[in-house]
Swiss-Prot record:
InterPro entries attached to this UniProt entry: Toxin_34
Keywords annotated in UniProt: Disulfide bond, Knottin, Neurotoxin, Secreted, Toxin
Disulfide bonds: C6-C23, C13-C29, C20-C52, C22-C40, C31-C38, C58-C73, C69-C77
Lineage: Eukaryota, Metazoa, Ecdysozoa, Arthropoda, Chelicerata
Name the UniProt record assigns to this protein: U5-ctenitoxin-Pk1a
Family: Belongs to the neurotoxin 04 (omega-agtx) family. 02 (Tx1) subfamily.
CC terms in the record's Gene Ontology section: extracellular region
Tissue localization of expression: Expressed by the venom gland.
Length: 78
């Protein structure tokens, strides 16, 4: 199914439709135990890069202000 929209953080999301459900490069579909109660959630810094790389090919990526995926900063940052 072509995604023509995306959900904001905190909105319920469909686990089966991947993180493309959720608006934002670092926002993913997080589910409770047993894959229920799934909601769009902002990824921790350590996961954000992987989520972003995953979402580069989302067909609806133009719907959110897409950023460059930045490697997580390990040490001596800024």
């Amino acid at each position: 199914a072509e995604l023509k929209s995306c959900f904001p953080v905190g909105h319920e999301c469909d686990d089966d439709a991947s993180n493309c459900n959720c608006c934002g490069d670092d926002v993913y579909c997080a589910c409770g135990w047993g894959r229920w109660n799934c909601k769009c959630k902002v990824a921790d810094q350590s996961y954000a890069y992987g989520i972003c790389k995953d979402k580069v090919n989302c067909p609806n990526r133009h719907l959110w202000p897409a950023k460059e995926c930045k490697m997580p900063c390990r040490r001596n940052c800024g």
